[in-house]
Amino acid sequence: MKQDDLGIKDAADGLSNSQRQWLQIGGLPPECVDDGFYLDRDGLANEMTGWTYPYHLIDFETAAVALPFHKGRRPYEQVAFQFSHHVLESDGSVRHQDEFLLAEPGVFPNYAFVRALRAALIGDQGTVMRWSHHENSILNAIKTQLLEDAAPPDDMAALIDFIDSITKGGPRAMVDLADVARRRYFHPSTHGSNSIKKVLPSVLISSDFLKAAYGQPCYGSAKGGGIPSHNFTDMLWWRRTEEGVTDPYKLLLPVTANAETPAVNQGGAATNAYLCLQFEDMPDAHRLVTEKALLRYCELDTLAMVMILQAWQHWILQVN
């Protein structure tokens, strides 16, 4: 196949879809071969000038089921039961700042969820970042739920104002890092995917900074220079294998020692874990380890965003 066969078109800003397709088919341009990836350093650096520290990286876990668990809710209505929140400061320091999980059987979590998210983010005007459109869609769905509620909470207006401020079109609209990756970054190992589960291993294998930073047990370490974490202690994220580097999501252990119980290491498993938690007859010990697995998984999602940002930042600095 030749470039002409794809009808390649330039994008207004960054890579177009057809240009990404050609990188996947034709390989990296000569000037990118030594790096092993394509990064629009100038475009990314310019885009970053519009961001404000501290950076707030957030990720949600949600469910939408045919038979609602909560009284008065509709089939397939969005339920937001969990979020994770990392902060990246201008000096490069990182911390797992906040987390939220409400999986008590019969308790509709959405309003408490957005209330906790608001409390986590209103302390400054730092840029809020997500991966893909999911978080934006969920917040808008919660806004609709608030507006349609016959007996809304007393703080409905404040919650809606907050949602409007960080969703698309708002004065503090979230930055979609998946969209940034689509326009600015391509690594052959992702096979064209912009899933965070594909992008994270690609930056880990290529970034000397990440190797140095996470190739030692600093995450969740109480020692000087350690990265504060709610759910990990002395965690080593960068681990060499014969094939390259271990995918961090594969380091998340199964909920129980039962081989038939899968690890919570992707969104579908997180949703299933939440659904299991809605059954009141779940033993307390199993409930505890399931909730812990959910917390660890969601924390890794926002840490993954931090790592990707750090890799991009240091690749820009290497040139500039």
Regions found by a protein language model. Give the residues of each.
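DEDD superfamily 3′-5′ metal-dependent exonuclease/proofreading module
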Residues: 1-320
